[in-house]
Amino acid sequence: MNYKVLLTLCIPFASWAAADYTEQDAMRVQAVKTYIDNVLQEGRSQIKTTPLLADGINTTTRKPVEWIYPDGRTATISNFANQQNFLRALTAMSVVTEDQRYQLEAVRITRYFMDNFIADNELFYWGGHRFVNLDTLELEGPQNKNSVHELKNHYPYYPFLYHVDPHATERYIKAFWQAHVEDWQSLDMGRHGSYSKNYDDKVFHRPIPASLVDQSKLPIMPETKGLTFINAGSDLIYAAYQLDWLAPSANAQGSAAWGQYLMTQYKLAKHPKTGAPVYQFTSPKKREWPPQSDKDTNSKYGDRAARQFGPELGDIAREGNVLFKSNDKSIVFNNALIELHLAEQRNDAAIREQVVDALLNFYRLAYNPENGTIKPIFSDGTSIEGIPLARDGYYGPKGRVFNAHKPKTEEYLLPILRAYRLQADPELWQLAANMTHHYGWGSLGNDAKAKPTLNMQLSSVSPMTLFSAIELYQITQQPEYLEFARAAADKLVEKRFVRGYFLANPRYLNASIDAIEPLALLTLDATLKGKTAQVAPYLSGSGYIHGEFAGKENAYDTNEIYKQTR
């Protein structure tokens, strides 16, 4: 791995001295090795001999998983966009074992994909609605989604892709923006990109327009045809900044400037009084008169939140202001991790402060420190907790009730700790201390200098437990956090390493090869060996395929395939 790639694969914070390494530490790495070996052996086609891998494996039959079309036809799924954390795990395995075979395997897989599955307009054939049939090498996709290009919270491993093929990676990022932005003056963009839209090598040469968001009109947002979901926008932002980082000699391309412009629109659209972040910075423009039935929620009929909540809540009822129904997670988990990574990578104080403000303003409104739950709110703080929906709509059927929820894992905690590592705001520490208390961790103490009292016998752990504990160790250098991470890692292997794969529930039948557990375990091992900075950081990443599946019109593989039970 050359010096430039090493820099781009790194977590920018320092690696500290190695800890004493034990036999138990080695056993955890052996579990990951077994998992990787199983994926590489059982995840390949028995019909077509290629380096490509299936997205998942049936842990009973040991065969690749399949997409089932409404007519009963099946296709073995190989979606490279849904395998990016597996690539990160392969490169991390080479770091901790000093065995380059794993990274070379990652190169082989990546090169084959990039040599064979790029469209004429330079888009990759991957994402939420497009994949390769592993057994035929034909392109596939759910029929009701028109096989469009879509990335939402995917966050590809761009530094590694660039290492393998700089030319294809650069052209892909340009094509990604070209395909998803319909109007560059209004930044009318959408989550769906066309494979037939022409490639433009000078896509980032366009002049930056004036900001679209007029803060004097908030909470009413400007109207566009496209849907500016932050889970799609953050992938565009990340890609633009990564192109600038990886190819700085081509800085005149303006990719970072466009990434900053898009990021700024979300910032400008935050609520003017509470400062709470938003999910969109525009509202869908009404292009047709809505039907009588509220169950038809196509965005061409206008803002779905205004239709469903407007009569009761007024102007705040806009899609961008909705901070529930998983919108909050996309903002304060996925997007926060990406922007924190960019802030650290570029040493950009403005991005860092923007993320810290968004996190604090959201949790001041939504978080209940008494029980560790998060309320369903709009960006002005209006809560709909316990209130039945008055009518059918995009956010659920009439009568549905949204309640406060406690995240099942520490995913909301992780960005708070990463933010604190970059900007030691005492309010962030107190928030983290309260959250960990409700997860049964014990006590972090009043500040980062305090000696923690930690529960080494957690009954429930996840990869987020490990990542969060590692952040605390990086922040404090307190050995208790490292021992806590080791104990959590042992429990993680005990509970989730099942039939040679990592499963969130041992009763699940199919294992995704993009499981996060291996990267979490290898990040811990790298930390123990003083090699944290050589391992690719965890940036979330939520790969999926969405569309018609086995007779269901609106299905996700994450539910229909990976939550099947034995």
Language model segments and positions:
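Hydrophobic h-region of N-terminal signal peptides that target proteins for export
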Residues: C10-A17
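Sec-dependent signal peptide recognition
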Residues: M1-T8
